[in-house]
Amino acid sequence: MAEERIQKIMVLFEQPENESRLERLTGKLMQVRDIRGTIGRMAMEQVLDDLELFELKTFALCSEEIRGLVEEWRIVLLPELEPVVRLLDPEGNRIPHFYIYDTYSAELARLRAEIKQKSLQGAEERELEALYVQSVVLEDKVREELSVQLRPYHDDLKQALEAVGLLDVVLAKARQAIRGQLTLPQIPEEGEMVFEGLFHPQIREILEQEGRAFQAVDLKLEKGTTVITGANMAGKTVLLKSVQLAQYL
């Protein structure tokens, strides 16, 4: 299945009309952070703090953009996280920022406005502190309510994070395969093993940096013992390393 995804992406890379979308996709994948810890706290039904709510909002926004970019390609299945976005972005700004917005609580909005007004009027510190404590209690209540409202989306968030991680890996492998002129091997269950244009990627890269070329090798290995002969420094060790690396990969 992973091989099919890689091949599909390699085909997409070869089509010029996909270049802009693939660049945007790469940029979005670079913005994704590992939020497994936050998702784990959701599973334990804990109250999330502002940083964790920010992580969920940022990931949900990013995942939705990625879903829009790859949905028609059918490379990975990304669940819809728009309900998560609506919970954490009540004002609909769709920016990677989180705050206990006034929209969450009319009482909190009133308290904040009162604190601001009394501060401008030079109210006593004790009075302002009392109002501030009330606002903190209301903010904690909002966090608790949000944490409860987000719990039904735990599985979707977990699935989306795994799918985005898989997409990142197969995209990188496809890009590496194209740049390195790599092919998907056909592995026989028995019989001879054939390598065409075999090379060692690291050694080839070093030679190219020095303005030299790597001599690719065609090789057929049959069941039994194979003896490699040749002059000193003729490439026997490099050939063995290339075969070993190809076999390992």
Task: Write out the residue ranges for each language-model feature.
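Charged/polar positions within long, soluble alpha-helices
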Residues: E14, G37-M44, E65-I75, A113-L120, ...
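Conserved glycine(s) of the Walker
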Residues: A234-K236, L240
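Conserved NTPase motor "head" modules and their coupling/switch loops across ABC/AAA+ ATPases, GTPases
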Residues: E162-A234, Q247-L249
